[in-house]
A protein has these predicted regions:
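N-terminal mitochondrial targeting presequence
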Residues: 1-40
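Beta1/beta-strand and adjacent pyrophosphate-binding region of the FAD-binding site
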Residues: 35-52, 72
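Glycine-rich FAD pyrophosphate-binding loop
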Residues: 45-47, 61-95
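N-terminal FAD cofactor-binding segment of flavoenzymes
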Residues: 59, 84-134
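Short beta-strand to alpha-helix junction loop
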Residues: 95-101, 146-173, 302-303, 337-340, ...
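Conserved FAD-binding catalytic core of PHBH/FMO-like flavoproteins
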Residues: 107, 212, 221-353, 361-364, ...
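Conserved N-terminal helical subregion
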Residues: 119-236, 241-253
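C-terminal helical "tail/cap" subdomain of flavin- and related membrane-associated enzymes
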Residues: 351, 412-491
Length: 491
């Protein structure tokens, strides 16, 4: 069990700003001009105010060893609506995150989870996953595998929470910190360059962040939590390698039939064009994540609400041939689906989700999918976390969990560096973070990428082989099912 950030030992007093320089200054670098005004000096500057960046700011302020650091967070968007978020009871946003137990433990530790409204959180402890071509299926049910509700083992696979809800809770916990970070929103990063020698400090290896307001911030440590197109990563000259999938993820929020007679499960069906998933929300609500081609996503967006609902219901009931045909209809999908379902034998709930009855207005949206991995996570006085370091296909629901795992690791190693008298921007402090996170993240990226490729085949020898593999997992031979489920609960 990993050590709590809040109880890492403190071995020494807070240290002075100026640390030893560990690298020679390259003449090819961009430097602040001699006439530039002196920037405001921070221990840590975080670029990016999404869930990962906010978690980092909250964790730095909550951990005993790092809570004396002077921190600034920069976000281009307006954080006001997120801070003031007050949702309607009968409405859920379309961007939902699946938080695994280890992520929730960290959120509790840094004081965020108490600000998450439990009436808007849906936990689930079972999944139904099946092959859209062969019907081979694996059922992940923690209650069956680990002794039911009376067991001492936590049987929760994940907790479904709206993105904006999580960010709202993080902002609330940041507001409670004794030493609050400087929160700079509605402001873009215009330029990042290296500093200069001043009367107080030698900042020639310090990143200087110039904002759209003209304000300048000097960072003992600059952290990029600024997404897949990270300006911080670009400044550091770190390559990010990977590829686009030529797939988009369609998201939407639905009302569903009464499912009170069935357990709250997540459902995922692997179709050759991409997986389609229904994820549970509180009450009679559910969330869609359908990865498919850009053309099919455009078709789904263009459908009338009743036809779109019929199309999603069909995705869990009809053959791939039928689904492919329905994608060619511009209207009348509901009627056509009703007839095709009447002549098709398909499973019943809880093996498949209950029927969707309505799509919430304004919740249909999509975004492109890609797999990217930075060559490294750290540079001179610089670190990357979350999507700035790695971007993953959403089929496994691990993107944000991996990012928050990065945060835990980075804060832990910063605290360790402080305890050993090291400069927080030095390679001695930062390299252990990369060593701990890079290979596990790379393995997860590779596994999900291969899974995407494997289920893209409609015919050929791999189709029966993958079905055999699914059957072996479902029977829990060699404890494979338990192993996969336990790994899914870790960041």
């Amino acid at each position: 069990m990993r050590q709590s950030l809040l109880h890492l030992p403190i071995k020494r007093s807070p240290w002075a700003f100026q640390g030893s320089r560990l690298a020679r200054i390259s003449a090819a670098r961009s430097y602040a001009s001699e006439s530039s005004p002196n920037p405001e000096v921070y221990d840590v500057v975080v670029v990016g105010g999404g869930p990962v960046g906010l978690t980092l700011a909250a964790a730095l302020g909550a951990a005993r060893t790092t809570n004396n650091l002077k921190v600034a967070l920069i976000e281009g968007m307006n954080l006001g609506p997120t801070r003031d978020w007050n949702p309607k009871p009968e409405y859920f946003a379309n961007r939902i995150v699946s938080l695994i137990p280890s992520t929730v433990r960290l959120l509790k530790e840094i004081g965020t989870w108490k600000h998450i409204r439990q009436d808007r959180v849906q936990s689930y402890d079972g999944m139904q996953v099946w092959d859209g071509m062969t019907g081979s299926r694996v059922e992940f049910d923690w209650n069956k595998l680990w002794g039911g509700k009376d067991s001492q083992t936590d049987t929760t696979i994940a907790h479904m929470v709206e993105n904006i809800h999580l960010s709202h809770g993080l902002l609330k916990s940041i507001d409670e910190l004794a030493l609050k970070p400087t929160m700079i929103d509605k402001t873009k990063v215009e330029k990042i360059e290296y500093g200069k020698m001043t009367n107080e400090l030698d900042m020639r290896d310090w990143p200087i962040v110039t904002l759209s307001t003209g304000q300048k911030l000097a960072a003992r440590l600059l952290i990029g939590a600024d997404g897949g197109n990270s300006p911080v990563r670009t400044f550091a000259g770190i390559e990010s390698r990977g590829w686009d999938y030529d797939r988009h993820s369609m998201v939407a929020t639905f009302r569903i039939e009464d499912d009170s007679l069935f357990p709250k499960f997540a459902y995922q069906r692997f179709l050759p064009s991409g997986p389609v998933a229904i994820l549970p929300l509180p009450g009679n609500f559910a969330n869609l994540a359908w990865s498919t081609t850009p053309e099919k996503v455009a078709h789904l967006k263009s459908l009338a609400p009743e036809d779109f609902v019929a199309m999603v219901n069909a995705a869990f009931r009809l053959s791939y041939t039928d689904i492919d045909y329905l994608h060619n209809l511009k209207s009348g999908v509901a009627e056509e689906t009703k007839w095709r379902e009447s002549v098709t034998k398909y499973p019943e709930p809880p093996q498949i989700p209950v029927r969707i009855t309505e799509v919430l207005e304004g919740t249909r949206a999509s975004f492109p999918l890609k797999m990217k991995h930075a060559d490294k996570y750290v540079g001179e006085r610089l670190a990357l976390v979350g999507d700035a370091a790695h971007t993953i296909h959403p089929m496994a629901g691990q993107g944000l969990n991996s990012g928050i795992g990065d945060v835990y690791s980075l804060v832990k190693h910063l605290a360790d560096g402080i305890n050993h008298g090291q400069d927080i921007g030095s390679s001695f402090t930062l390299e252990p973070y990369q060593a701990e996170r890079y290979l596990p993240n790379n393995a997860l990226l590779g596994f999900v990428d291969k899974l995407h490729t494997l289920y893209g085949f409609e015919t050929g020898p791999l189709v029966p082989l993958r079905s055999l593999g699914v059957e072996i997992i479902n029977k829990d031979w060699f404890g494979l099912k338990r192993f996969l489920m336990s790994q899914a609960a870790k960041s």
